[in-house]
A protein has these predicted regions:
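Conserved active-site/ligand-binding neighborhood in enzyme cores
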Residues: 1-332
Length: 332
């Protein structure tokens, strides 16, 4: 399988609302899961080319087409690529050393708090993160990928009443990227066209307000060890199937036979729900909710996952939810 990187430069704020955001009180984040991207991609491709859409679905079912979640990148002096912090490391935080001075204790507490709140880590910093006592590397510069905000809107269908929409705006040089695993290179051209079409209408929520519009930042990048930097290291980790710790880079829905392997790992559950458009009633119908394993979940071996297929009341076509994972072998 060959791996490509698609980098997205967002032209407008994004709205990726999840039940997790509401529960935690987080107004908005830039977390766009692979199932959201796949659903949007299939919808756009079906309007563009029904046969191509069927080929995408068939390739995913056979494991020949894989997507990661949208992950952050930052373009500065170097092209920095970030991945989720492994869940098995979040519980292995050293306690505070009460023998230290008050000033040193405060610094240690701040470092501990930053460690607990960290969601993403640069690819080139993974080894140092996993082996903090062996590393002599300097601390990497931290970037703000953007900021959360709230915008006021007027609903003229209901007398011009005001309502508020949370969103996330990316900083200059920051954006999101997606790792695409592909067996059949013949699908790449159609995939790029579908993604470009998707960018015109936007991805995520509140697209009618202009949110989620993006363009591709250059052509798809084929990952190889010759790429150098974060991209070259990412390629090595994606191909590392022998590591005793395999981290998923996308939401995952395992099959029954894989539950035993999942139980040996470290993971967090994420509720996924949504709506599907019913052309007969001209309304959106709520589709079944499902709990999936978040990106960053770690297992002793790679758990393939599956593509879920649902039916919705009044909807004549099948409804899919992506639940397969892209993995990287961690350097433990």
């Amino acid at each position: 399988m060959k791996y490509y990187i698609l980098q997205f430069k967002f032209l407008t704020p994004v709205h990726f609302g999840t039940a997790e955001n509401k529960k935690s009180g987080n107004l908005q984040s830039f977390n766009c899961c692979a199932d959201t991207f796949f659903s949007a991609l299939v919808t756009e491709t079906a309007a563009l080319d029904g046969e191509l859409c069927s080929r995408f679905i068939e390739a995913v079912q056979k494991g020949g087409l894989l997507f990661s979640d949208f992950l952050p990148y930052y373009s500065g002096a170097e092209e920095e690529l970030y991945v989720p912090v492994p869940y098995n490391c979040k519980e292995k935080v050293n306690p505070l050393d009460l023998q230290l001075s008050f000033k040193e204790l405060c610094l240690q507490y701040e470092a501990l708090r930053d460690h607990e709140n960290m969601a993403y880590i640069r690819v080139s910093g993974i080894y140092d993160y996993l082996h903090p006592y062996e590393s002599t590397a300097k601390e990497q510069e931290k970037h703000d990928f953007g900021w959360s905000g709230v915008q006021r809107r007027l609903d003229f269908r209901n007398g011009g009443r005001a309502y508020y929409v949370s969103n996330y705006t990316f900083a200059e040089g920051a954006g999101l990227y997606c790792i695409v695993g592909l067996d059949d290179e013949a699908l790449l051209e159609g995939l790029v066209k579908a993604v470009e079409l998707l960018g015109l209408g936007g991805i995520g929520g509140r697209r009618s307000s202009g949110f989620g519009k993006f363009v591709l930042k250059g052509a798809p990048q084929l990952l190889s060890e010759d790429c150098g930097g974060d991209a070259g290291m990412l390629k090595v980790l994606l191909e590392n199937k022998t590591s005793s710790l395999q981290m998923s880079l996308s939401v995952l829905c395992p099959v029954q036979e894989q539950i035993a392997t999942v139980k040996k790992g470290a993971f967090s559950l994420l509720k996924r729900s949504g709506f599907v458009y019913n052309q007969n009633s001209q309304n959106f119908e709520k589709r079944s909710s499902v709990y999936m394993l978040k990106a960053g979940s770690c297992f002793p071996e790679r758990v393939e996952g599956r593509l879920l297929e649902f039916t919705a009341l009044g909807v004549q076509h099948a409804v899919y939810r992506y639940g397969k994972a892209v993995y990287m072998g961690l350097p433990v």
